[in-house]
Amino acid sequence: MVFYKYSGSGNDFLITQSFKKKDFSNLAQQVCHRHEGFGADGLVVVLPSKDYDYEWDFYNSDGSKAGMCGNASRCVGLFAYQHAIAPKEHVFLAGKREISIRIEEPNIVESNLGNYQILDTIPNLRCKKFFTNNSVLENIPMFYLINTGVPHLVGFVKNKGLLNSLNTLELRALRHEFNANINIAFIENKETIFLQTYERGVEDFTLACGTGMAAVFIAARLFHNTPKKATLIPKSNEFLELSLKNDGIFYKGVARYIGMSVLGMGVFKNGCF
């Protein structure tokens, strides 16, 4: 079984093809493991589709399925073009979402995430029980729960340096309380936003999270009056341009091919697939 490794904004993914829908959860856990596998934030399985150029099944590194992953959408778009599965401009199905892809040479990929949904606005008081003494999060007056394909909790700090002082245990508690990824961000100016994301399914900070960047972008736009186009800078420092248009949220940034790996037959005998 052949896996192609791609990276987008600091997220890395293993991409493979299958002609049938199967449960790849165990396989995802093994191949995404950083020490015992090839190492990746997630596994993308590209499948044939009657109505679209292709569709995918996406798995987090812990084997859980997710309907959407923003940076993976750009990576799989580049993969599909480079492997003659789809043209430069195409549409694929991610769960129930139609994702449009546009590739600009040599490796700039734009994807349309589609629409978003504001699920809730959460005052600080509802979260205080999860904070430790002198918590960075204490001074965030309001959190925003936003669905950009998967749910994200977003809060803004007033000092960029605080992004490096976040408490993993606090974010993990919030992640389980709201069953969402946790994003803490700083608006440097109206068009530049820094963020850190604690991602469910990875259960730790990640170098980047596309849907998390989208949620932060929307929260900043709606509640902090930022413009319809901004640059988001995650932990990886690989920036992503986000824009809001009539038909949804658009990502635009670099995606790159890293390498290829081949999985031997031993994994099949061990019952991992």
Curated annotation (Swiss-Prot):
GO cellular component, one term: cytosol
Entry GO MF terms: diaminopimelate epimerase activity
Enzyme Commission number, as recorded: 5.1.1.7
Location of the active site: C69 (proton donor), C209 (proton acceptor)
Entry superkingdom: Bacteria
A single BP term in Gene Ontology: lysine biosynthetic process via diaminopimelate
Keywords, comma-separated and alphabetical: Amino-acid biosynthesis, Cytoplasm, Isomerase, Lysine biosynthesis
Keyword match Amino-acid biosynthesis: yes
InterPro entries per UniProt: DAP_epimerase_AS (IPR018510), DAP_epimerase_DapF (IPR001653)
Broad EC category: isomerase
Site annotation Could be important to modulate the pK values of the two catalytic cysteine residues: residues: H152, E199
Pathway terms, separated by semicolons: Amino-acid biosynthesis; L-lysine biosynthesis via DAP pathway; DL-2,6-diaminopimelate from LL-2,6-diaminopimelate: step 1/1
Any Pfam family the entry gives: DAP_epimerase
Subcellular location: Cytoplasm
Primary location recorded for the protein, binned into one broad class: cytoplasm
Catalysed reactions listed for this entry: (2S,6S)-2,6-diaminopimelate = meso-2,6-diaminopimelate
UniProt key word Cell wall biogenesis/degradation: no
Sites where the protein binds substrate: N11, N60, G70, N71, N181, E199, R200, G210, T211
NCBIfam families: DapF
Family: Belongs to the diaminopimelate epimerase family.
Annotated function: Catalyzes the stereoinversion of LL-2,6-diaminopimelate (L,L-DAP) to meso-diaminopimelate (meso-DAP), a precursor of L-lysine and an essential component of the bacterial peptidoglycan.
Stated name of the protein: Diaminopimelate epimerase
Native organism: Helicobacter pylori (strain J99 / ATCC 700824) (Campylobacter pylori J99)
Gene name for this UniProt entry: dapF
